[in-house]
Amino acid sequence: MSLRIILKREFSQCIRVLESGSKSPTIANRFQAQYGNKNNNSKRNTANNGTGNGNRFHNKYNNESRRPYPKTKYQQQQQQQQQQRKPQQHQQYIIDPRKIKFDNGTESARNAIEEIINRVYQLQRNYQIQLITDSGLKKCHLSEILQKLDLSINGLQLIDKSTTTTATTTTPTTNTSDEDLPLIKIITVRDMINQYSTYLNNLKQLELIKLGSSKTLKTLDIKLKLEQKKSTTKEILMKWSINNNDFKLQKTNEIKKLINNNGGNGKSFLINMVYNKRNTNKPIDTIFKRRSNTEEDEQELIEIELQRRQLLIENLQSLLTELNCKWTIEGDINTKMTFNVTPKGQPTTIEPSTTTNIVDEEVEDYNNNNNDDDGDCDEKKMNRTERKKRKSEQQKQKQKQKQQSKTNTNSNTAKEEDLDALYSFKIED
């Protein structure tokens, strides 16, 4: 019983001590009461001063508040180069254009693309180019275009710059300036193959010239002469749909001016009769497909158009005969016709009938004055009357010919007007 009482007293004292320790931590935790104040004071000092008072080296060599030294020119150049290289870091992962393989397209198209890639490499080793677009020039890499290209439809064209061909063909460059970059344009595959074939032909001709073949030299001379003639020869473009009035007023004056400017020295010129400037070789069958609903209407329109074209050709031939010109015809009435015209001499502006009459009268008067003393008066009078009769008969014949020509021209104009009216009426229907 006594032990139980003692234990209960001690247990109750322990509980009291614990309750008093929870209320006052200084009494319960002597170590915290002794050493906790020192730690709190050190934290307060560091917060007030920013750094500990005891760390002299930290206060002496603190570089946060100090301004940096100014950079040298070399350091500035390095910084600029690093900034320029940052946007170009993705170029390291671009595919080499020579490693790109095309699944579509013919062998000739692939060979042409390979040739263009090699020529671009000779001009610019990093394959940086300028692409010609509708909005303008665009700087890009050649592989970006080749990956999106469909060889069955489109191709590429390398445009030579006249100012930089001599410098770039000999030594390849790696400059990224826009002026030195090669120009590339997207075109059709057919045009690319044609350009590639002409390029190969020129290479073969150069090889033959180096070997010393005379045939190639002759052919080149002939080609150069033909090109010079084409450049010098002038052309007159005439549409099939021209009216009769426009032909008489405009085109006749153009042809006469061209002959007068040449001076009638025999310089040839061309008259191209086409459907349109854009569609020069458009066939007559394809003109009326959209306009006519049935085949019969289409055939009627084609027949009317052929008659109009035939009359236009006849009028042009009659005009060339009046101007004393020779011509040769090439082409077809269904698509395109070219008149290669060469004038024989200078065009006559004054009518010959008036000049001949004046000269004949002067000669007759001179002869009559000289023969007054030798012949009889009756014979002179008879000769004069006969001559007057002949002159009057000749003048009457000329007037009849003029009237016939006028009637023919009027009939031709009436025919053309009728054909134009039929043509417009059919189109409206």
UniProtKB/Swiss-Prot annotation:
InterPro entries: AIM23. It is found in: Mitochondrion. Keywords: Mitochondrion, Transit peptide. The keyword Translocase does not apply. Its main location: mitochondrion. Residues 1-18 form a transit peptide. Residues 34-91, 365-429 are annotated as: Disordered. GO terms for cellular component: mitochondrion. It comes from the Eukaryota. Residues 386-403 have a biased composition (Basic residues). Residues 365-377 have a biased composition (Acidic residues). Residues 36-50, 75-91, 404-413 have a biased composition (Low complexity). Belongs to the AIM23 family. This is Altered inheritance of mitochondria protein 23, mitochondrial. It comes from Candida albicans (strain SC5314 / ATCC MYA-2876) (Yeast). The lineage of its organism: Eukaryota, Fungi, Dikarya, Ascomycota, Saccharomycotina.
